A protein has these predicted regions:
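Short glycine/serine/threonine-rich phosphate/pyrophosphate-binding segments
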Residues: 142-144
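Generic alpha-helical propensity signal that fires on short helical segments
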Residues: 22-28, 77-79, 85-86, 140, ...
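Conserved nucleotide- and phosphate/pyrophosphate-binding catalytic cores
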Residues: 154-306, 310
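NTP-dependent nucleotidyl-transfer catalytic core
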Residues: 1-138, 148, 155-160, 173
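Generic structural microfeature
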Residues: 37, 56-57, 139, 167, ...
């Protein structure tokens, strides 16, 4: 909207190596088929947030397997491996932290080379797409600045890094696809109902942070909503706004209406017609954690017949 061309880079190649940043042990390596599957899923998910089809300045989605997969290892180490020294690479926090763990839980050569491949990504994007700014989470600072250094040494040009803090909860734990208690954009992994409930059950402290990070509301509105919430926290005004906005953004208006009705059913605030209209998958989500027993249809039918035949 402001003239920049966003490029979403998917790590089809680097995903096979595993980024050591922020990890105390080596990641489990994914197979090529698993990564291809994930790439397609990610493309579908981000299409809700970035427009790849608009005529003016469309976003671009790229997979680094398209260029890294074609590299000859000897040529790569000769042309790019000589550019970054081992001293420079070992100065990165992610490397120092892993090496300090000792020999048993140290860093493999595979993981050590990760930053060189990510640096090459930045160089490739600048050379072929005039990309001069790379954005990412704060744990990617070392990898991104390695790219800046590679670009400087290979071309003499300036490039830039922008990172944002990793999102953490009030208890210090972080969001992440490999963390416990995570929430997914894919409705098959986190249903719209559970997605809505996740935000609805957020703490007051977390919600004050989430509304600033995840919604497009302006500062004046956010400040007034926080004040209103603090005056009657039992109504969970802040949580309801965040849950509604994010469910609409990630899923749809229809899904939002459905999960709100589902919540009303659970707390006995609905009509019989609401119960008839609700989708089966949403209904099952509501009562997933509610104590229940299963009765077969045949067993219930036999019981009913027995009641009819009983003498008055």
């Amino acid at each position: 909207e402001y003239g920049h061309k966003p490029i979403l880079l998917i790590g089809g190649a680097t995903g096979m190596i595993g980024d050591p940043s922020g990890k105390s042990k080596e990641r489990n390596l994914l197979s090529e088929s698993d990564i291809s599957h994930n790439v397609e899923k990610i493309k579908n998910q981000v299409s809700k947030f970035l427009d790849f089809k608009k005529q003016k300045n469309p976003a671009l989605i790229l997979n680094n397997h398209d260029w890294i997969g074609k590299l000859n290892i000897i040529d790569f180490f000769r042309d790019y491996g000589k550019t970054l020294t081992v001293n420079y690479m070992m100065s990165k926090e992610s490397v120092k932290k892993r090496i300090s763990l000792g020999q048993s839980d140290g860093m493999s050569f595979t993981e050590f080379t990760y930053q060189l491949f990510q640096a090459y990504d930045f160089y490739h994007l600048m050379k072929n797409y005039d990309c001069k700014i790379q954005m990412g989470g704060s744990d990617q600072w070392g990898n991104i600045t390695s790219g800046i250094e590679l670009i400087r040494k290979k071309t003499g040009q300036k490039s830039f890094a922008i990172t944002c803090p990793l999102i953490t909860k009030s208890d210090g734990s972080k969001f992440g696809k490999t963390e416990d208690g995570n929430v997914w954009l894919d409705r098959n992994k986190t249903s719209p109902y559970k997605f809505y409930q996740y935000w609805l059950n957020s703490s007051d402290e977390d919600s004050e942070s989430y509304i600033k990070i995840f919604t497009m509301a302006d500062k004046k509105f956010i400040d007034s909503l926080i004040l209103e919430h603090k005056s009657k926290p039992h109504e969970r005004i802040l949580q309801k706004f965040i849950a509604s906005e994010l469910t609409k953004m990630v899923h749809s208006e229809e899904d939002l209406e459905s999960v709100i009705k589902a919540s009303e059913i659970f707390f006995g605030k609905s009509t019989f017609s609401d119960l008839e209209e609700i989708k089966e998958d949403v209904f099952l989500d509501i009562f997933e954690d509610v104590p229940s027993v299963k009765i077969s249809k045949n067993e219930r039918s036999e019981e009913h017949t027995s009641e009819l035949q009983s003498p008055v």
